[in-house]
């Protein structure tokens, strides 16, 4: 026997639907884990694949992983899951792709080498709009 179709609306998968609110939560989670040199770049007008980059650093592999865990946990609380995660096990550069924003958590040397802030220099730095 087939289940009866429901006419009730389903709950949205994402409860934090406002991108800036999600970025603000990610910033707070990173700050809670003592992320250093945190920057938020607004890429909406210079990129067609995401609206914001959150870039920050940790001083060790463990701290980079702890920051990534904290951001993911905070997003899970809002029923938001990353589309893709890269680099967690190595702890040098962890990328958390949430679609409309991407979190980059580096150790110092890879951050200097890849220099995303310089690469995306046309994007406004809006960090102060997201600090708690």
Report residues per predicted region.
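Long, contiguous binding/interaction regions
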Residues: 1-40, 44-45, 59-66, 73, ...
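Glycine/charge-rich, flexible interdomain linkers and switch-proximal surface loops
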Residues: 39-49, 83-100
